[in-house]
Amino acid sequence: MPLSPRPLLVAATAAAAALALTSCTSREETPAAPSSGGGPAASAQSVAPSADGCTLEKTGYAKVDLKTAVVGFSQSEKEANPFRIAETQSIKDEAAKLGIASDKLLVTNAQSDLNRQISDIKSLLDRGAQLLIVAPLNSDGLQPALDAAKAKKVPVVTIDRKVTSQPCTDYLTFIGSNFVEQGKRAAQAMVKATGGTGKVAILLGSSGNNVTTDRTQGFKDELAKTTGLSVVAEQTGEFDRSKGQAVMEQLIQSHPDITAVYAENDEMGVGAVNALKTAGKTPGKDVKVVSIDGTRNAVQLIADGSYNAVIESNPRFGPLAFQTLQKFESGEAIPASIVITDDQYDETNASQKVGNAY
């Protein structure tokens, strides 16, 4: 499925400045706010060098020419998930755009196995990777792989999930969303969809990573401000459509009075919709559905009236990941976290913006 050229909008937390990246511009402008429209945002502001940031000099690593370097990308999960498909494709597309030869981009997939991801990263290093981009499976457990990269003085950019290791020591930086904020925005969308009353079921993501923890915290903290909505059930669907559907089927039986579902990714949300339809309920109306990601399937369901809102979590990390590596190699300071700001889909814009989804 073709990817929309809509950019990632980013905010570098350590620099207290917003970043917005597109694949077609490198000019500096004033910091950009999150886009509310469907068109591409045109700003791309650099992160100012800072004593608090991580620099090539501070790490003592040798300078590498990105265009001729061997770059390794470690994907964490099987690419049956639209997020992972788009994420990997974005890395490949940006590498090609930069003129990196296909045999200089090494890609592995851990198939949701932590030990395999550790082995994959070590294998990438053994195969000569000079720069690494890693989509961690879990927040914990990758230290042996990060130690191996550090021993070879290979910078590591982590994307999507934050690891508990030390930035600028064990890895260069984290690029990803503010997952607590995503949860809060999902709760706000739920309040709007339900009118602030009802019984909510939460389909949790997989355990052991900050995405699930933060999206749950943000949602519950925000929902607590509304007295008419209560969480009556929560169970993990492992970020998987079929598991989300199975969990929803169970929850319909045990809690037939559920009036709203918060799924911590779209795949589980789509699974919940399938379960609700099978049970004779009308998702989007009888039972409100809000999730996080921005997949085309979920956004189309909003347009069709079977879903209520999606908070985007943009997987197109390629341009920003490579831009960050380029800045690091040129001597600029890189903040510990680069946080992207995500869009939102609901009944007011889904039909117009479905082309931006992945």
Predicted features and spans:
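Hinge/cleft segment of the Venus flytrap/periplasmic-binding protein
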Residues: 11, 25, 33-68, 203, ...
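C-terminal motif of bacterial Sec signal peptides marking the signal peptidase cleavage site
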Residues: 19-23
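Extracytoplasmic "Venus flytrap"
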Residues: 46-90, 94, 98, 105-119, ...
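Hydrophobic alpha-helical segments within soluble ligand-binding/sensing domains
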Residues: 56-59, 66, 71, 92, ...
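Short, solvent-exposed amphipathic alpha-helices that sit
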Residues: 83-98, 182-186, 210-229, 243, ...
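Short beta-strand elements at the ligand-binding edges of bilobed clamshell
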Residues: 109, 165-189, 202-203, 234, ...
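Hydrophobic alpha-helical
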Residues: 134-150, 219, 233, 237-300
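Flexible loop/hinge segments that line or gate small-molecule binding clefts
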Residues: 140-181, 199, 295-303, 345-354
